[in-house]
């Protein structure tokens, strides 16, 4: 796992000094603390800090197209010879790469048979030779998580690619003379004259989803390369293309786990279980390839317990597992994690922390680059900090919910669909104002609150209904917040299009499957995977996700929804397939989630900061929000008339982010203090 950054150009005005790319890589040093190097096309070789510059700041002259590739390395595989940027045999193709290619050993013999000569044992070099052999189609051969940039010195072009699910991030900006790119936005901001104009469209999207979705960026003119896309920069033009999609529109695969064709595409439930066990076991085994210590996150939920259990079965000694706990019972899963660890026989590490929002906020804001208000980033940061003390690589259960119907909202989607088919007169009663008479609750996940939300949205189309369930601020609330001037800047932009486009991917499937597909294309890469990547890389920890192996994802996408979702809940096939790895209490427990007590914080330790942040004259002077609307949200939350904790967190994060990234003339230095004192339990 590493960090990448660089610049490419196509005109004589484009060449850049080494020092610019060194600055771009230095600001993401946390992603790769073990080594740093750059490649400069003017001399066609790799440089370290000790080498004289290829082009000094006062002498940036070079004819024709070129590139500088930067790399920060976290050593995982081939510790001795895997330095990057790395080249092919004749040094005509250079790569800077972030991620892991798990099937690199399987790919190598065929490439060697085709005449390619390997100089290292790294997975990185496999990509270089695949590109030589297949060009942009090289991505179709890769099994792993990745973003990379390849400079093709013969064709004078830059090739960028991102993995299928979107586990690794890639930002880029195109201007008249340059294409700049990097693993994090802060790297691009090191480029001289990098603009920082706030995008009104991105703010509107952020307040809808709690993140800024691809391909948008919080600053105008910057973009995120979408998952399963590659980009080609040549002759000053940038072409992007999609190379993969989850096959929700297809039926059961016509091949088995051994690669041979099956006689029929109509599988029995037992056949599905057999294929699932084989495919997920293979995904776990591939992700255990490492030349450094590895372990697993273990929350005591179904997904992380299955991953930990498979790792333990594949290991000759107890694996390391890690869980984090909190003093507040409703947010603490350590008892389940402890039970799972004892059941599986792992070497378990458990810590209880008392999170202090005031101390963690600066670190969150600096690392996340863009506004990002999923509060589970807080415990994910704590867990990553604790895990990195023991191992360099951790496997996680991320993706199990989206692939196998783990969220309660998928059940709600199914219930709402059945209610949609009721006679019109019954729906008329359910959609009438009678639902407003149900006593309310300020608890985010109370059954009364869920029933009210379900009935309130029955009259809408399924896609719009789902958006109302998952958004932070709906259209009406956002428009009530915005000042006249900012509303005009947002204009007619429709934040729902991002989700609706994802729903359109598989129109012929049942609506629960369509919803899972939409989440895999939107919420999973933009929220869950972004959260985990940033939090883990803040501590130079590599996180691997077996459920997000594209072979597992393809199998799950084709699977009939009734195998995943039953009347009692989701993940039915996971529980039945891996029953031997799951303690009975974990098979039947309710999903807890990974959260913090935001509502209490905003009535306690965070209230002064909340008011100072949102109602400060300098904040209001930005002209984005109406002061009276902000005050109303705070008052309603204070008086427990409504739980606005997620909305207030989103607004506070946005303002503090602007103070960090918009107001200063340069991106700030990273906070150096630890998150908080951590109480050791076991």
Report residues per predicted region.
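Short secondary-structure boundary/capping segments
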Residues: 365-367, 408-415, 668-669
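A polyampholytic, Gly/Pro-enriched intrinsically disordered region
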Residues: 343-346, 369-375, 439-445
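Alpha-helix capping and helix-loop boundary segments enriched in small/acidic/polar residues
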Residues: 328, 352, 371-374, 421, ...
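Active-site adenylate/phosphate-handling loop in enzymes that bind or generate adenylated species
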Residues: 83, 164, 176, 382-442, ...
């Amino acid at each position: 796992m590493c960090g990448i950054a660089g610049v490419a150009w196509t005109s004589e005005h484009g060449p850049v000094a080494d020092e610019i790319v060194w600055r771009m890589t230095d600001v993401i040093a946390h992603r790769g603390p073990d080594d740093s190097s750059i490649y400069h096309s003017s001399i066609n070789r790799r440089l370290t800090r000790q080498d004289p510059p290829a082009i000094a700041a006062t002498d940036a002259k070079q004819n024709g197209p070129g590139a500088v590739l930067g790399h920060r390395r976290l050593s995982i595989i081939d510790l001795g010879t895997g330095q990057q940027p790395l080249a092919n045999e004749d040094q005509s193709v250079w790569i800077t790469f972030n991620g892991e290619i798990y099937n690199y050993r399987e790919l190598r013999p065929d490439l060697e048979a085709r005449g390619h000569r390997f100089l290292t044992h790294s997975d990185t070099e496999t990509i270089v030779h695949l590109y030589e052999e297949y060009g942009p189609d090289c991505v179709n051969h890769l099994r792993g998580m990745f973003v990379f940039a390849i400079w093709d010195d013969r064709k004078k072009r830059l090739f960028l690619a991102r993995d299928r699910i979107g586990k690794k991030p890639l930002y880029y900006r195109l201007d008249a003379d340059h294409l700049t790119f990097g693993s994090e936005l802060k790297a691009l901001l090191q480029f001289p004259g990098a603009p920082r104009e706030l995008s009104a469209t991105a703010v509107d999207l952020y307040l809808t989803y709690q993140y800024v979705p691809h391909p948008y960026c919080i600053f105008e003119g910057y973009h995120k390369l979408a998952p399963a896309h590659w980009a080609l920069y040549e002759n000053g033009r940038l072409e992007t293309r999609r190379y993969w999609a989850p096959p929700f529109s297809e039926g059961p695969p016509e091949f088995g786990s051994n690669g041979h064709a099956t006689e029929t595409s109509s599988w029995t439930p037992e056949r599905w279980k057999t294929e699932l066990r084989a495919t997920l076991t293979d995904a776990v085994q591939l992700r255990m390839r490492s030349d450094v210590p590895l372990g697993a996150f273990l929350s005591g939920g179904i997904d992380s317990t299955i991953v930990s259990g498979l790792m333990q079965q594949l290991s000759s000694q107890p694996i390391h597992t890690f869980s984090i706990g909190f003093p507040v019972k409703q947010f603490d899963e350590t008892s389940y994690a402890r039970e799972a660890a004892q059941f599986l026989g792992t070497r378990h590490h458990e810590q209880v922390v008392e999170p202090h929002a005031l101390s963690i906020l600066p670190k969150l804001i600096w690392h996340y680059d863009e506004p990002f208000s999923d509060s589970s980033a807080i415990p994910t940061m704590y867990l990553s900090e604790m895990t990195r003390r023991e191992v360099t690589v951790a496997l996680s259960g991320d993706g199990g919910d989206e692939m196998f119907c783990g969220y309660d909202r998928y059940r709600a989607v199914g219930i709402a669909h059945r209610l949609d088919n009721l006679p019109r007169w019954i729906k008329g009663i359910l959609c009438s104002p009678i639902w407003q008479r149900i006593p309310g609750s300020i608890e985010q996940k109370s059954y009364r609150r869920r029933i009210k939300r379900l009935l309130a949205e029955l009259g809408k189309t399924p896609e719009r209904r789902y958006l109302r369930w998952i958004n932070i601020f709906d259209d009406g609330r956002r428009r009530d917040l915005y000042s006249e001037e900012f509303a005009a800047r947002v204009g007619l932009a429709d934040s729902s299009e991002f989700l609706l486009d994802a729903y359109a991917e598989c129109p012929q499937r049942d609506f629960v499957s369509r919803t899972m597909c939409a989440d895999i294309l939107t919420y999973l890469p933009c929220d869950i995977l972004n959260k985990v990547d940033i939090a883990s890389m803040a501590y130079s920890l590599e996180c691997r996700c077996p459920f997000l192996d594209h072979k597992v994802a393809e199998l799950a996408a084709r699977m009939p929804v009734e195998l995943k979702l039953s009347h009692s809940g989701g993940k039915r096939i996971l529980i039945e397939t891996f029953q031997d790895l799951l303690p009975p209490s974990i098979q039947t427990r309710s999903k807890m989630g990974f959260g913090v007590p935001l509502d209490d914080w905003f009535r306690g330790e965070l209230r002064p900061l909340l008011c100072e942040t949102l109602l400060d004259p300098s904040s209001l002077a930005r002209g984005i929000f109406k002061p009276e609307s902000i005050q109303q949200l705070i008052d309603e939350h204070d008086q427990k008339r409504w739980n606005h904790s997620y909305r207030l967190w989103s607004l506070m994060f946005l303002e503090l982010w602007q103070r960090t990234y918009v107001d200063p003339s340069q991106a700030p230095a990273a906070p150096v203090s630890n998150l908080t004192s951590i109480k050791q339990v076991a």
